[in-house]
Amino acid sequence: MNKKTIWITGGSTGIGKALAIKFANKGWNVAISARRENLLKEISDENENIYGFPLDVTDKSKCKEVFEQIKNKFQNVDICFFST
């Protein structure tokens, strides 16, 4: 069975971070995006199911690029949660 994948923007702090940890602890692949790469790295270093993808959501072309990177890594995205 393939693991489910969720992409969470605003995943480095607050609700986004809490949600990322919750899904990761349930065995999901969790792609998190935020502007602060250092926070993304801290979170992904703490949980093997969390992967950071730096992103400024105001850049539409970068949003598309990051979404494609996530799809390429996990083959699918089951849920997108925009917590920005």
Regions found by a protein language model. Name each.
Residues G10-G14:
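Conserved glycine-rich cofactor-binding loop
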Residues F23:
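Aromatic pocket-lining residues of Rossmann-like dinucleotide-binding sites
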Residues K26-I43:
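Conserved glycine-rich Rossmann-like NAD(P)H-binding loop of the short-chain dehydrogenase/reductase
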Residues L55-V66:
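The beta1-alpha1 cofactor-binding region of Rossmann-like NAD(H)/NADP(H)-dependent oxidoreductases
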Residues D78-I79:
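Conserved catalytic-site loops of classical short-chain dehydrogenases/reductases
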Residues S83-T84:
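Conserved NAD(P)H cofactor-binding loop of Rossmann-fold oxidoreductase domains
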